[in-house]
Amino acid sequence: MDPLGAAKPQWPWRRCLAALLFQLLVAVCFFSYLRVSRDDATGSPRPGLMAVEPVTGAPSGSSRQDTTPTRPTLLILLWTWPFHIPVALSRCSEMVPGAADCHITADRKVYPQADAVIVHHWDIMYNPKSRLPPSPRPQGQRWIWFNLEPPPNCQHLEALDRYFNLTMSYRSDSDIFTPYGWLEPWSGQPAHPPLNLSAKTELVAWAVSNWKLDSARVRYYQSLQAHLKVDVYGRSHKPLPKGTMMETLSRYKFYLAFENSLHPDYITEKLWRNALEAWAVPVVLGPSRSNYERFLPPDAFIHVDDFQSPKDLARYLQELDKDHARYLSYFRWRETLRPRSFSWALDFCKACWKLQQESRYQTMRSIAAWFT
């Protein structure tokens, strides 16, 4: 008997019950773990859970954080500097709207890693196969044929068959269009001061360095100057000291923007810089009037083809010299447009933008067949 007189508790059956409950709890946990593991392994969403978890840390009502991976910076190799002369480069995001920056360099050590190589035709024109980048070409690397010269000045094009993936030139049908100049719209305050007609003390100017007697432009000039005084600057003509060209040409009412080669879209700095930036009305000899009108208003220039002879053109220019209202009509387009001239940095950034937009890989079968 218990000395206190109380009966002993029945401990054995309680211990069995506790052990049974513990085993049941362990079994439930184990099977739950197996189910979760199976769901995670198969990737199927579990009931009541999101397949993609929301971004944490964003305040209520704010837009979700952009989780799109950023594009890698493209590496572009300039196989040579244009005409072997280094030029200043700029951030492409500041040069071309919508473009991301590219790393552009002329360091050939990066050739194996470069996404693209820009090859300036003039710099490899003589014996091109020995001057092109070496083989084997890195997988996926694109080569860009870059040229601003007309077909007669481009030799050995046939040696470039199947080497290049993209074209880059003044031709508007190039993969990368790099004209010598263009007009851009503007609004608000005038982008330029009003034309000071009293400063236009001279009539017609022409600056020319490549003087060939048998060329179309020299022959036309020789016929024109028989009826009209033309001041010619350049080699074997009036000197034009460096840094004074714009100041000198701005004194003239008209400028002869005569191209040295007559080919579609070949409209050079003779018009965009020498004439328009000097506020002289360009008298053009080059591609057709309709070709010029793709890039300029019809009343922004005078085309030699509009006249039956150089004598008729001379008479027309003399009439405009005396009729201020008609002369000033050639500047009306400047109320809404302004001229811009090319830069090497901008051209390279256009290539940067094109490479970002166009990922397909193509091969030019024949540069010569396309360009000439």
Swiss-Prot record:
Query: For this protein, what is the EC number?
Result: 2.4.1.65, 2.4.1.152, 2.4.1.-
Instruction: Quote the cellular component terms of the Gene Ontology held in the record.
Output: Golgi cisterna membrane
- Which stretches are transmembrane? 16-34
- Give the record's keywords alphabetically: Glycoprotein, Glycosyltransferase, Golgi apparatus, Lipid metabolism, Membrane, Signal-anchor, Transferase, Transmembrane, Transmembrane helix
Primary enzyme class: transferase
Question: Where does the record place the region Disordered?
Answer: 40-69
Task: Give one Pfam family, short name only.
Answer: Glyco_transf_10
Q: List the stretches on the Cytoplasmic face of the membrane.
A: 1-15
* PTM comment: Glycosylated.
> Where located?
Golgi apparatus, Golgi stack membrane
Could you tell me which Gene3D superfamilies the record lists for this protein?
Glycosyl transferase family 10, C-terminal domain
Reactions mediated catalytically:
a beta-D-galactosyl-(1->3)-N-acetyl-beta-D-glucosaminyl derivative + GDP-beta-L-fucose = a beta-D-galactosyl-(1->3)-[alpha-L-fucosyl-(1->4)]-N-acetyl-beta-D-glucosaminyl derivative + GDP + H(+); an N-acetyl-alpha-neuraminyl-(2->3)-beta-D-galactosyl-(1->4)-N-acetyl-beta-D-glucosaminyl derivative + GDP-beta-L-fucose = an alpha-Neu5Ac-(2->3)-beta-D-Gal-(1->4)-[alpha-L-Fuc-(1->3)]-beta-D-GlcNAc derivative + GDP + H(+); a beta-D-galactosyl-(1->4)-N-acetyl-beta-D-glucosaminyl derivative + GDP-beta-L-fucose = a beta-D-galactosyl-(1->4)-[alpha-L-fucosyl-(1->3)]-N-acetyl-beta-D-glucosaminyl derivative + GDP + H(+); an alpha-Neu5Ac-(2->3)-beta-D-Gal-(1->4)-beta-D-GlcNAc-(1->3)-beta-D-Gal-(1->4)-[alpha-L-Fuc-(1->3)]-beta-D-GlcNAc derivative + GDP-beta-L-fucose = an alpha-Neu5Ac-(2->3)-beta-D-Gal-(1->4)-[alpha-L-Fuc-(1->3)]-beta-D-GlcNAc-(1->3)-beta-D-Gal-(1->4)-[alpha-L-Fuc-(1->3)]-beta-D-GlcNAc derivative + GDP + H(+)
Q: Name one GO molecular function term.
A: 3-galactosyl-N-acetylglucosaminide 4-alpha-L-fucosyltransferase activity
Q: What does this protein do?
A: Catalyzes the transfer of L-fucose, from a guanosine diphosphate-beta-L-fucose, to both the subterminal N-acetyl glucosamine (GlcNAc) of type 1 chain (beta-D-Gal-(1->3)-beta-D-GlcNAc) glycolipids and oligosaccharides via an alpha(1,4) linkage, and the subterminal glucose (Glc) or GlcNAc of type 2 chain (beta-D-Gal-(1->4)-beta-D-GlcNAc) oligosaccharides via an alpha(1,3) linkage, independently of the presence of terminal alpha-L-fucosyl-(1,2) moieties on the terminal galactose of these acceptors and participates in the blood groups Lewis determination and expression of Lewis a (Le(a)), lewis b (Le(b)), Lewis x/SSEA-1 (Le(x)) and lewis y (Le(y)) antigens.
Which PANTHER family does the annotation name?
3-GALACTOSYL-N-ACETYLGLUCOSAMINIDE 4-ALPHA-L-FUCOSYLTRANSFERASE FUT3, ALPHA- 1,3 -FUCOSYLTRANSFERASE
Give the protein's recorded name.
3-galactosyl-N-acetylglucosaminide 4-alpha-L-fucosyltransferase FUT3
